[in-house]
């Protein structure tokens, strides 16, 4: 029996896939538990429509992320922090600190999960920080750490 998976099912398939399952398995397990629906022409048509909508949504998300990345490239984000002699910071700067500065500079919400730091920043200077935005868009931004007077 052909069924369309409504949810990811381990060792069987991912959401939206059309699979062949034995009649008993489909009728007694998958369909009653809400894991799958029978693959009728109407269901297949609806599945195609949902895939198209998801594709359009992902394209819009990618376009929005590319615009945000180009806006990020226009700025050098300056962060003031207390530092001792030799330029070492008292403490460190994390992705949360950087996202706060970006949010204030751009007047937009910027999630700290989008910033990829291998290690926290612990010294004064200019750094290239990797950002991974939704939609698979990534790039580097400039962050300058200055001494707080």
UniProtKB/Swiss-Prot annotation:
What does this chain do? Binds to the 23S rRNA.
Quote the cellular component terms of the Gene Ontology held in the record.
Answer: ribonucleoprotein complex; ribosome
UniProt keyword Coiled coil present: no
Protein's UniProt name: Large ribosomal subunit protein bL9
Q: Which family does it belong to?
A: Belongs to the bacterial ribosomal protein bL9 family.
Tree of life domain: Bacteria
A GO molecular function annotation here is: structural constituent of ribosome
Name the gene: rplI
